[in-house]
Amino acid sequence: MKWICAAGLLAAMAATCQAPIERDMLAAHNSVRARVGVAPLVWSKELESAAREWAEKLLAGGEFAHTPNSSYGQNLFESRGRRASPAQVVENWAGEAKNYNASSNRCRGVCGHYTQIVWRATKQAGCAVAGNEQREVWVCNYDPPGNVTGQRPF
């Protein structure tokens, strides 16, 4: 059985499923942004819709890849055998902060998920999750996108 959790579906699902995800994803993102003095993000239904479509496609196809040729920034998270909370998803990405050196504006290892979260110019986010018994896929889209080569996130 497949499940999808995103706004725009049935009102009952939106009330029981999306509201907490929207609220919790935004709170988790904004908590990380506040740590470095960056303004909070606002939720975008458009970005959420695009995230939902991509999460569903990834789940159905058994894939895990960024949306090709997207004009948005994007973070992906995959969980197998357990469900993750919005806070766990964002903290997984934010954990890359240890790999980012703000003085040199360089990463030691992976840090692009973290820098996208704290990218000062990014103003909006929209996220969704799609899952089944074996796997769930989280997608967050950001606008304007971050991780512009040569620029600092904050």
Which sequence ranges carry the predicted segments?
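Disulfide-stabilized extracellular recognition modules
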Residues: N69-Y72, R80-F154
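Short, well-ordered surface patches within globular domains
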Residues: C17-G73
